[in-house]
Each structure stands twice: as structure tokens, then as C-alpha cells.
């Protein structure tokens, strides 16, 4: 696998825990831990981080970001 979703972040201005969990269920994502409640985001970890991957945060839609793990190009050979 060359990439995976490590976490999903929901803006607290637009989502509460109930609506965030509904979005996760609708997209077949299962958090492995309880929500990490920060100042601005609700963070749901989907997979444990792995040091072999480089991580990038991508905006999915208004109020939702995904942390994506990608193998470095050197490891894809």
C-alpha cells in the first residue's frame, strides 16, 4: 500500500462529536481511539502513525481535513 488515511480532523466550528461520527460511519472509517479534542478540531485517529510514511494534511471539504500517509518515492521501488 503506497498511501493511507491516518486521521480525520473536523472543525469544531462546524461539527460536534455526533455529526463527526456520522460522517465517519458514512465513509466507512472506524476510529481506533477516542476523539482527541483540541482547541479548534476534533481529531479521530484511523490508523497508528508509522515512521516509514511521510504525512500530509489535505483539505477534503469545508471543515474536514485528512492526514494522509504516503511512502517516500525511494521506498516505492
What is the predicted role of each segment?
Residues 1-77:
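Mitochondrial intermembrane space
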